[in-house]
């Protein structure tokens, strides 16, 4: 079995977290397990389910520049404690640098930076985020994005690496007698002849 260590904000019912849980529920957990680095102190809605499914939740020191050395040590210790952890998958946009650098120092050979948003929020952390964005490609072995625009906005450019990918958001094509009221009619846009579809 290999374990994939995901770095997230916390495991509440956000878009990224819900997507990860949809995958987690359906993978063969005898072969692959998910663990989670959470970067907020607040417990997440999915925490109990993760533990029931066999996953671990690791509380980080937080994404604060003052905690950066402690954060690197935390990731190294987390990886060293379980040699089955083979992959670090960061979902924190530019701030994923913290987990990726820790994983690099721990010797993990697969370190994925995954961009999900099309912008970097301009808040008081914006200068730090822009700094991390420039360093992030050097810490990651793979740059993934939900779409090309997300890659160009959130991830600094680097010359083509074989592991860099763009993954469109998956849609469910399962027929439903009663689609939710907010579901868009998108058969024409996707080329499907009939039916409702919505992001799962």
Protein language model regions, located:
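Membrane-interface segments of envelope glycosyltransferases acting on lipid-linked substrates or membrane lipids
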Residues: 1-200
């Amino acid at each position: 079995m290999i374990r994939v260590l995901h770095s997230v904000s916390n495991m509440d019912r956000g878009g990224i977290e819900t997507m990860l849980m949809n995958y987690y529920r359906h993978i063969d957990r005898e072969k692959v397990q998910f663990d989670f680095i959470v970067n907020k102190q607040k417990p997440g809605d999915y925490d109990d389910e993760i533990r029931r499914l066999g996953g671990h939740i690791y509380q980080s020191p937080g994404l604060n520049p003052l905690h950066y050395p402690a954060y690197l040590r935390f990731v190294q210790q987390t990886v060293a404690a379980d040699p089955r952890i083979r992959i670090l998958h960061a979902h924190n946009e530019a701030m994923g640098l913290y987990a990726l650098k820790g994983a690099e120092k721990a010797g993990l050979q697969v370190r994925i930076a995954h961009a999900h948003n099309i912008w970097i929020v301009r808040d008081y952390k914006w200068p730090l985020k822009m700094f991390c964005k420039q360093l992030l490609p050097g810490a990651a072995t793979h740059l993934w994005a939900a779409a090309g625009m997300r890659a160009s906005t959130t991830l600094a450019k680097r010359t083509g690496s074989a592991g860099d990918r763009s993954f469109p958001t998956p849609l469910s094509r399962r027929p439903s007698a009663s689609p939710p009221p907010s579901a868009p009619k998108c058969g024409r846009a996707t080329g499907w002849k009939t039916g409702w579809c919505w992001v799962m």
